[in-house]
């Protein structure tokens, strides 16, 4: 739904969620359902949680559900001017989106774009960017997107993603 509404590739959203939250296992994602490491600066009026990241006790956005984190991520990319250039890319061009996110400063890891692309390719998430992507993904990968529990148990080559980036600071 976010891909149709915002034009953000589903594969990018999923890969960022996987990478930033360590497949939903990071302390931040468990404590606050924050699967994208988005900090609570500027005019954030929602719930907050404090977590040591680049500095001690940084403020992060907290969400009532995982779905709310994904919705806020889409709105965050859509409303932050530094990401405007990304929307010139096709929602099926995950490689340009990955490079563009890195260039716009989403993460500090020098290989952030490559890590996103590796996750997308290893997990076949690019299938989600196609028409009827959920059905196509389920038929080709043997997994349903709506039932992600245990998704990566068969992804033995998947690296530990939590080391890939630092949290997203809306002021940078």
For each feature predicted by the language model, list its residue ranges:
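LysM (lysin motif) carbohydrate-binding repeats in extracellular/periplasmic proteins that recognize
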Residues: 172
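Catalytic cores of secreted/periplasmic lytic hydrolases that degrade extracellular macromolecules
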Residues: 1-169
């Amino acid at each position: 739904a976010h891909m149709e509404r915002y034009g953000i590739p589903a594969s990018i959203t999923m890969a960022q969620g996987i990478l930033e939250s360590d497949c939903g296992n990071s302390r931040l994602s468990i404590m606050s359902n924050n699967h994208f490491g988005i900090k609570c600066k500027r005019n954030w009026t929602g719930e907050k949680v404090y977590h040591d990241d680049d500095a001690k006790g940084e403020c992060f956005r907290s969400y009532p559900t995982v779905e709310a984190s994904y919705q806020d991520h889409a709105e965050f990319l859509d409303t932050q001017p530094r990401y405007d250039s990304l929307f010139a890319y096709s929602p099926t061009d995950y490689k340009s989106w990955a490079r563009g996110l890195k260039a716009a400063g989403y993460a500090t890891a020098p290989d952030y774009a490559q890590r996103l692309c590796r996750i997308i390719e290893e997990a076949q998430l690019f299938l989600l960017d196609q028409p009827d992507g959920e059905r196509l993904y389920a038929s080709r990968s043997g997994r349903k997107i709506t039932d992600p529990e245990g998704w990566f148990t068969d992804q033995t080559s998947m690296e530990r993603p939590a080391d890939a980036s630092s949290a997203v600071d809306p002021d940078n």
